[in-house]
């Protein structure tokens, strides 16, 4: 780490946010699947409606998914689908 205080440091947290979103969606997906739900349908229902009851409470999945904004989830899903970085 430099001791040069004449330059502004930049911090890019977009990769961390992407990793967090993927981790949360994976955990939620697995929890929904374990409970016998169709995870894709349930996640779509949540993303469209904003109603968290589409997501099971099992393994804290509902609380996890609510840590993310729905628009942020959609942004990451679309970027991943289109393979955009």
Curated annotation (Swiss-Prot):
This is UPF0297 protein CPE1779. NCBIfam families: PRK05473.1 (NF003997). Belongs to the UPF0297 family. HAMAP family: UPF0297 (MF_01507). Transmembrane segments: none annotated. It comes from Clostridium perfringens (strain 13 / Type A).
């Amino acid at each position: 780490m430099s001791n040069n205080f004449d330059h502004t440091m930049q911090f890019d947290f977009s990769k961390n946010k992407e990793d967090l979103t993927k981790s949360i969606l994976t955990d939620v997906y697995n929890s929904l699947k374990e409970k016998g739900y169709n995870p894709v349908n349930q996640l779509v229902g949540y993303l469209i409606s904003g109603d968290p009851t589409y997501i099971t409470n099992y393994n804290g999945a509902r609380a996890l998914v609510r840590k993310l904004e729905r628009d942020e989830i959609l942004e990451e899903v679309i970027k991943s689908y289109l393979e955009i970085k």
